[in-house]
């Protein structure tokens, strides 16, 4: 018995890991280091190419619930994240290099997983396969996937934020603080006056960008929108988004700044910080010029500039079942961002479910699905339910089904905690049956 997993990103490593728990051999194909996508830089598996944050740990946030659900199913990604975490207040952020290394070593030392470093250009039709090649799937494989799905792929863009060397930040202007003084002071804050903000705004919206094709310009996903695109929506849009000053007091003035740029720790040793919300497609020379207008970053050393890259995903509502296998080819499963889920953990969670169902299929068992009153179940239902305009979706309480009794509770936090409690009970019950 053997299952093929194509792609060793977050979804792929989860699929391979969970399949091995059933005693089934896995052939894991990963084209790195022989070939890299435009956004990937390191040899290791499960590389984080956008932010190093895995979002909130709180159960009142859907991302917090998703984490707990994944842990119930023995998530390797969550195990690695907790082992390589960096301080980030109420969020779970990781040292991206240690995180990828942790996962890579776990996969390499799993006796049931064979790793083949080759590019796959065709999906095998005669094997049980999990396709988890991500949003930067190669053109040759996309062409074959398009034949499999009998539909055109959809395209959108992600943007990665720049990373700055902490020692190059001017702390006579920048300062450490958390919003409303909640949690530890994990963020570096660069305060702006109205004049400084407006100058930055005008330079940003007029800066040179790396051009994209006309038909692709409107396909930016809101969750990772380039800062310059956000700025073009209005002069104050950034001040109500990533540059919002509320809850921050400048120790120099004792007052709330007009705007604040925040930087979050990117590595455990605290040497590198990423610019929160500053995903961008500005040319590198323009990033250096414009972002150095931010107070405290006048001499900033950028160890990585922001990059813009194409993401591709299948039209899941048309071609995928709630068990994550193709309607036309039940032996071929899809997982990760290529299915239209958006986000690190969202991708990883679908890898777990696809892996479980691939294993169950080869063992002659019925596939499982989580109900829509769980976070994972709601995500999968969203991407597999037919809709007129299918767009990527990340974890949020808005897509989770609730019963009438819970819906009557007016206190939002109490309501979310009850939803989370019920969801986790369902997950535990199912996990006990699956892994008994």
UniProtKB/Swiss-Prot annotation:
UniProt record similarity statement: Belongs to the MnmG family. TrmFO subfamily.
Residues holding FAD: 7-12
Main location group: cytoplasm
Protein name as it appears in the record: Methylenetetrahydrofolate--tRNA-(uracil-5-)-methyltransferase TrmFO
GO MF entries: flavin adenine dinucleotide binding; tRNA (uracil(54)-C5)-methyltransferase activity, 5,10-methylenetetrahydrofolate-dependent
Biological role stated in the UniProt entry: Catalyzes the folate-dependent formation of 5-methyl-uridine at position 54 (M-5-U54) in all tRNAs.
Cofactor(s) essential for the protein: FAD
HAMAP family for the chain: TrmFO
InterPro entries, sorted: FAD/NAD-bd_sf (IPR036188), MnmG-rel (IPR002218), MnmG-rel_CS (IPR020595), MnmG_N (IPR040131), TrmFO (IPR004417)
Gene Ontology CC annotations of this record: cytosol
Entry's Gene Ontology BP terms: tRNA methylation; tRNA wobble uridine modification
E.C. number: 2.1.1.74
Top EC class for this record: transferase
PANTHER family referenced in this protein's UniProt entry, alphabetically: GLUCOSE INHIBITED DIVISION PROTEIN A, METHYLENETETRAHYDROFOLATE--TRNA-(URACIL-5-)-METHYLTRANSFERASE TRMFO
Keyword entries, A-Z: Cytoplasm, FAD, Flavoprotein, Methyltransferase, NAD, NADP, Transferase, tRNA processing
Location of this chain's protein in the cell: Cytoplasm
Pfam families recorded: GIDA (PF01134)
Gene3D superfamilies: FAD/NAD(P)-binding domain
Lineage: Bacteria, Bacillati, Bacillota, Bacillota incertae sedis, Caldicellulosiruptorales
